[in-house]
Amino acid sequence: MSALQASLLLRPLPSPLPPRRRLPLPSSSASFPRAGHHRRLPLPLRALASEGPQPAPSPAPDPPPPELPAAPEAEEVVGTAAAEGGGKVEEEELEDLVEKGRAWVLALAAAVVAAARRFFDWVVSGDWMSWWPFWRPDRRLQRLIDDADANPADPAKQSALLHELNKFSPEDVIKRFEQRSHAVDSRGVAEYLRALILTNGIADYLPDEQSGRSASLPALLQELKQRVSGNEDKPFMNPGISEKQPLHVVMVDPKATGRSTRFAQEIFSTVLFTIAVGLMWVMGAAALQKYIGSLGGIGASGVGSSSSYSPKELNKDIMPEKNVKTFKDVKGCDDAKKELEEVVEYLKNPSKFTRLGGKLPKGILLTGSPGTGKTLLAKAIAGEAGVPFFYRAGSEFEEMFVGVGARRVRSLFQAAKKKAPCIVFIDEIDAVGSTRKQWEGHTKKTLHQLLVEMDGFEQNEGIIVMAATNLPDILDPALTRPGRFDRHIVVPNPDVRGRQEILELYLQDKPVSSDVDVNAIARSTPGFNGADLANLVNIAAIKAAVEGADKLAAAQLEFAKDRIIMGTERKSMFISDESKKACLFKLLYFILRELILTAYHESGHAIVALNTQGAHPIHKATILPRGSALGMVTQLPSQDETSISKKQLLARLDVCMGGRVAEELIFGEDNVTTGARNDLHTATELAQYMVSNCGMSDAIGPVHVKERPSVEMQSRIDAEVVKLLREAYGRVKRLLKKHEKQLHALANALLERETLTADEINKVVHPYQEEPQLSFQEEDFALT
């Protein structure tokens, strides 16, 4: 940018220094175009359009540094500044300032302004700002001006300058063309005509009826033709002279002339929009981060807080004494408690086990129906073990952000590694450990991290992972395999002895009346778990407090039991005494009938297993509901089995038929229930396996039948399966008739105790093993 541009940007002000040489100022018509939509002509072109090419001014030597003038000289400077700068300061005011001795202030200000102007001229004249985008068009135009002035006889460079100049100021194109000091060609003439149209100067050459002016456009075109006739170019047409050469006038939209301007504006607006969107995104991200951080405040467990990723460690020192649980507080699940006591003993005295090569189990999975005491067992381990205890709920791992669950798993095990040996307890692990599904990617990440931490490439020595769940069937097989969860401990519903121990535990800190029979309450609450019994005692205590009693009586406990079993009484509904007695009798009848039927059903299985060669030994018999079964007889093999004989398979068929046959013998053929459907399903599958896969049928022979046999073969297989089942049914009926007294004795023992072990079953049936079969009269007496 030249010094001429600097002289136009700043208004001339007087200076105590000698003024530098400057180019003549352009005229107002060249500085400001007529049309408001045109871009303003760059400053170097204003003098160019009015005076033509000028030789480049030689730079003047920099003046010496200014010295502060004396008062009289300052007065002269002020007067000069007032005259040349067009200031509004009156002479009287200046004289007052001089008299007051403040003229040096004006002189100093003038010197500062002059120095600023010289500095600005120096910056603008250099290439310091040439990298700015808005400076590039001016540089291009300045380059075209220099080329055109250096080659005035080159029409191509003159036309290029006129074409570029037409984008900024068509008036300057007209003035430069009409100076006749440069060579032109047809393209230059076209740019000149375009400038006339843009500035509406073409109207001066058209006829005017009001003034009587004739058209001079043909003369203009003839003149333009003569200007280009001497150049090596295509012959210039003379339009408008005849019909064969008409004059084509194109109306140009003023908006089209600012195409480059609009392009620059679009780029500028795009950049502004991008910057605005970026700022909004940054501000939104900052606000979101601040909001997330606020979720993790004091007492919160938000995603943004560091405490949300740190595991919870049980500190017995700050816990109330009543909240610290031990194995003494766990009743009704002796088998599960015994296995967990071994783990605690291992943690307290590891040398006792390691001397024989024993290793600490990596994982313990507690399963069972709700309310059986799985979490209570974990609390007892936390109270008994002398090692750190970390705990998390399965639902605490996942949140709305992907990756949070895996990070919390890593944080949990990192904290556990620092304090090993320790125990990590995850309650309701099915929330994160369920079978992996394709559409649950975030849950899979959490489960994968848990699998790696439990048994991955890096070994976690000294960390025992405990977990509790009510739904073990939906857990991922990779999680429940040995090496991750080595022990699966089932916490069942308590039996009669367990319920009695639980009731005594909950009643020990309460005043109890002497008429309360804990054993009777335990026998009258079959199917109750620990949570139900705790609720029973609590309801009875509230009832006693409402009635104002000093002690818990049997009436309050009976009321609580009835409320849990039958619900709240509807006292608003009137029922007669006869209806009450009938309903109570029916309820007791159905309950007792169901229990008696279940007891005989399970006793039938047990008696057949005891008296059939090849059957597995009995482990336990119970009439407590287990899953979908009302009762169960479990059998365990005495040793590992690699192959099974036909005798053993037939014994299994007989055991499956024992329950249905017992129901038919005791209650009659018409009173057989659907409780044996699972037994029949198992027996049918076993018989079909013997016939189709093992070749244990004389009618079919030693043949392995494929999955889809022919119709004839399938009918023969079905007939043989039915034959095996009927033969087993007949054998079992004869056996139970022979040992019917054992059946009655075992059923009565189950009704009394609900659960019997193998030794207890043998003690019950042993006195009746050698006695003969009962007569019909004795059978009726036994039933009564």
UniProtKB/Swiss-Prot annotation:
Region Disordered: list its residue ranges. 1-71
Presequence boundaries = 1-47
Where does this protein have compositionally biased stretches of type Low complexity? Answer: 1-12, 24-34, 42-53
> Membrane topology for this entry?
Multi-pass membrane protein
The record's disulfide annotation reads none
Which intervals carry biased composition (Pro residues)?
A: 54-69
Q: How is the cofactor bound?
A: Binds 1 zinc ion per subunit.
Binding site residues for Zn(2+): H601, H605, D679
Task: Tell me which Pfam families the record gives.
Answer: AAA (PF00004), AAA_lid_3 (PF17862), Peptidase_M41 (PF01434)
Which ranges does the record mark as transmembrane? Answer: 104-124, 267-287
> From the Swiss-Prot or TrEMBL record, what is one GO molecular function term?
metalloendopeptidase activity
Record key words, sorted: ATP-binding, Chloroplast, Hydrolase, Membrane, Metal-binding, Metalloprotease, Mitochondrion, Nucleotide-binding, Plastid, Protease, Thylakoid, Transit peptide, Transmembrane, Transmembrane helix, Zinc
Gene3D superfamilies found in the cross-reference section: 1.10.8.60, P-loop containing nucleotide triphosphate hydrolases, Peptidase M41
What biological function has been recorded for the protein in this entry? Probable ATP-dependent zinc metallopeptidase.
Concerning its family, UniProt says:
In the N-terminal section; belongs to the AAA ATPase family. In the C-terminal section; belongs to the peptidase M41 family.
Q: Name the HAMAP family for this protein.
A: FtsH (MF_01458)
From the Swiss-Prot or TrEMBL record, give the protein name. ATP-dependent zinc metalloprotease FTSH 9, chloroplastic/mitochondrial
What is this protein's gene name? FTSH9
